[in-house]
Amino acid sequence: MVEEHKNKKRRQEDGPADVPEKKVKVSKSEKKDKKEKKEKKEKKEKKEKKEKKEKKEKKEKKKKYEHTATISGSAQSSQGYTQSESLTNLPQSEIDSFLATNEVTIEDPHSLNLRPLLSFDQIQLNSKISAVVNKFPTPTPIQSVAWPYLLSGKDVIGVAETGSGKTFAFGVPAINNILTLGKSGLSVLCISPTRELASQIYDNLVDLTSNTNVKCVCVYGGVPKHDQVKNLKNANVVVATPGRLLDLIEDGAVNLGTVDYLVLDEADRMLETGFEDAIKAIIGGTKKENRQTLMFTATWPQEVRKLASTFMNQPVKVSIGDRDELAANKRITQIVEVIEPFDKEKKLLGLLRQYQSGSKKNDKVLIFALYKKEATRIEGLLRRNSYNVAAIHGDLSQQQRTNALNSFKKGESSLLLATDVAARGLDIPNVKVVINLTFPLTVEDYVHRIGRTGRAGQTGTAHTLFTEHEKHLSGALMNILRGANQPVPDELLKFGGHTKKKAHSAYGAFFKDVDMTKTAKKIKFD
């Protein structure tokens, strides 16, 4: 008994004996749960591994892209413009004579002092472009001065009258860069204020790229989007009006992230017509770094200066002619008649008999109305009087406007009736006479209207009908007439000089100029 007690105590101290474990029975549902948990864990680990791999690949791809971009940037830099020996050897007196004759002023914050090109053999371009530009005798003044700076990769502001060869001024360096650097995808964007001007720029660029594989596309409102969206695929150059381009961006049809050559043509016109916010939004979508920006404008008002200072990098400003001072082309004979408002239609018919009689029967005459309804009414008047007239204004479809413009250019119609949509930028050759049936809202528009004649070194005539309704503009008009050495009629003098002569005829003597060398500052409000 005592021995049994001792053995029992010993067993308690030594611990439990090695006895076989009893198996616990696991239910099917528990097995299923365990399996699902295991699969879920494996799936999660697999997903994390995949994400980690993708993240690594993305990082390596970005690094590779940045490296490529650096190489491309240095290649572009090494491709920088080199002045030809023949241009370098020209005497300075010849350069000075060119600058003085063409009233060229250059403001260069980089102090590069690049000489203007006086002939095409002084510039080295891709052979496919040279074949096109060599068809012209010499570069225009804006091309001569702008090309060296643009080919050097600088931002440029060109202040020059319309019809001065601005499309090739920015188009030649743009296409040359695409061909030389072997760029693919969307690289060049040109924004234009009107459908007609956008189409004109597009046609010129198509001619320039006719020997290349560079794809140019034009997008504007007034026509269906479908074909434009289709054409945008694989485009290298896009010419667009601001409204339609914004629509296409919002639709996801175009991505401007690769655009490194941005052109604003007729910048002053776009600001006048309320496109400032659209322009800023479009610029915001383009490439931020290493973007080359160009702005072409016929005038240089404060609004344009401010816009340029916000998104351009120390631009070189090139002015052809006295563009700070609003002035009319001196090759245009300006005639101003003060009449009663109700005499306009009768007077118009008399002027057409005067300017389209005898040997002048087929001379091109451009008539400006102020409003669309007025244009429609006058078009009917002229047709009733057996005149073959074409018309362009906002109530017409894009196809109708294009047909009318082509008809006038080809001489099928010798009369073109237009609202101010045609006053800026359009290249309409050989217009002999401009008739202002109704005076425009500003003298700036007056100067641009009459600038449709007297182009490319030719002379022209501008005949303006002025009424008491516009007398508040009489002083500004007199300044324009005197500045171009044109007679001021006594009837106009009777209205008095409502606008005094100032240091700047359009913007006064006390506007603040903008320093282009300073970057924009961010203002934070607490």
UniProtKB/Swiss-Prot annotation:
Location of the protein in the cell: Nucleus, Nucleolus
Biased composition (Basic residues): 34-65
Keyword Nucleus appears in the UniProt entry: yes
Sequence motif Q motif, residues: 118-144
Domain notes: The Q motif is unique to and characteristic of the DEAD box family of RNA helicases and controls ATP binding and hydrolysis.
Function: ATP-dependent RNA helicase required for 60S ribosomal subunit synthesis. Involved in efficient pre-rRNA processing, predominantly at site A3, which is necessary for the normal formation of 25S and 5.8S rRNAs.
Protein name from the UniProt record: ATP-dependent RNA helicase DBP3
Gene: DBP3
